[in-house]
Amino acid sequence: MKSIKPVLLLILDGFGHRTEGDDNAILHARMPVWSRLREQYAYGTINASENFVGLPSGQFGNSEVGHLNIGAGRIVQQDISRIDCDIEDGRFSSNDTLQQAMSKAQGSALHILGLLSDGGVHSHENHIHALIRAAQAAGVPKIYVHAFLDGRDTPPRSAETYLKRLDAALAECPNARLVSVTGRYWAMDRDKRWERVEPAYRLLVDGEGLFHAETGLDALKAAYERDENDEFVKATGIGAPVKMQDGDALIFMNFRADRARQLTSALTDPAFDGFKARQPKFGYYATLTSYGEAYSALPVAYAPQKIHNGMGEYLSSKGLKQLRIAETEKYPHVTYFFNGGEEQVYPGEDRILVPSPKVATYDLQPEMSAGEVTDKIVAAIQSGQYQAIFCNYANGDMVGHSGVFDAAVKAVEALDGCIERCVDAMLAAGGEVLITADHGNCEQMYDGEHHQPHTQHTTNQVPFLYIGRPAKIRAGGSLRDISPSLLAMMGLEQPAEMTGQSLIDFQ
């Protein structure tokens, strides 16, 4: 095989392109290296949201969707779109797995868990409403809804809207009621902070909340009086306490896996030891989508789509060595999601996980673990082992979600020196670099419509910076074009399954 030019892909998570705004952390940051590289090399912007990545119109992108599209080299129709279509066409209520769960609940109860918002990143309220209606129509006698509040992929204090819409749906379904409310910070942790998950678990399983309210709206009002935004609302029981009983059925309505896994482990894994608690013997426990190989025994309503000849698989088939590296918060994205939602590690694929700092929120340590990630990248480049290195820097997204503007500025400033070290090392090794992002976030830190911090993702385009030979970047691209561009940089033909195209016109 001819000599392959090594490449480095840097994914700056949540680092969107936006030219205006006093609330743009990137514009306010001191990033001389980033500015110089943009001037010196070929720079463009690409699409990372909506139909360009297999999402509905108006829906911003996210890390899972972004890395799926990047790794696949094609538009991947997302689960939210598949489920939306089934609801619209009337097929949702006849889904075999959902039917099984409702059947099992006829003599007991059906528990519906999920993130209640229209954020569209981890879940969508419309799916929860549709399941409530389906269960009512199927004659399920007791339908219990456990709502996780958002405030991260939605404005920090927006849950009133979603709770009111849930109340409207419940009003049409006399067998259903809301029984618990808690913020996603507790119920949807993904960093093994079991001290967060435990109070949410005890509320769900034993009906023992830290607080109690008669309605979801009352619970929210009390939480706001405690100065808790939606994400941080503490475990609150609603109405008469409800316990999960042996034989009950449960459906977890989050379609994104990473923040649903820990709670699912606590509820279903006999070997779970994160904390001591009663574990119900469910008659049926289903998940809306696959939560991964470790949960393969659980029924799934929407099985994953098989992606053949994505970037990782294709490089492996060519006998090339590749490295994936990220800190904890984004490690699943450069591995599991980049590989098309597959747990498999391909031959020749190495992985490095750098622990994220143990802080309550990342505005308290905006540099996160970027320095250590960079150390590992530089060492990997200098080792000469790898033809391709794929890295995610979490800062822009994780600190952007905090809504703290000054911290977001520091977060992206911390990346500037990291970028310089990576680029210098790769150029010295005779390689080339591509810098992009999976979606926007920290380029918009204030929500003018709601007059509060902007903590969610955006639909803005993202950077596409090629550092190597003289070139121009073609306009109109999207995340699906990143892998074909990398293959062009390496001098390799792209597989037929990749429908994206290289955006780099070498001069």
Swiss-Prot record:
Catalyzes the interconversion of 2-phosphoglycerate and 3-phosphoglycerate. Pfam families: iPGM_N, Metalloenzyme. GO terms for cellular component: cytosol. Belongs to the BPG-independent phosphoglycerate mutase family. This is 2,3-bisphosphoglycerate-independent phosphoglycerate mutase. The lineage of its organism: Bacteria, Pseudomonadati, Pseudomonadota, Betaproteobacteria, Neisseriales. Substrate binds at residues 122, 152-153, 184, 190, 256-259, 330. GO terms for molecular function: manganese ion binding; phosphoglycerate mutase activity. GO terms for biological process: glucose catabolic process; glycolytic process. It comes from the Bacteria. Pathway: Carbohydrate degradation; glycolysis; pyruvate from D-glyceraldehyde 3-phosphate: step 3/5. InterPro entries: Alkaline_phosphatase_core_sf, BPG-indep_PGM_N, Metalloenzyme, PGAM_B_sf, Pgm_bpd_ind. Coiled coil: none annotated. Mn(2+) 2 binds at residues 13, 63, 438-439. Mn(2+) 1 binds at residues 397, 401, 457. Binds 2 manganese ions per subunit. The active site is at 63 (phosphoserine intermediate). The gene is gpmI. It catalyses: (2R)-2-phosphoglycerate = (2R)-3-phosphoglycerate. Keywords: Glycolysis, Isomerase, Manganese, Metal-binding. Monomer. Its EC number is 5.4.2.12. Signal peptide: none annotated. Its cofactor is Mn(2+).
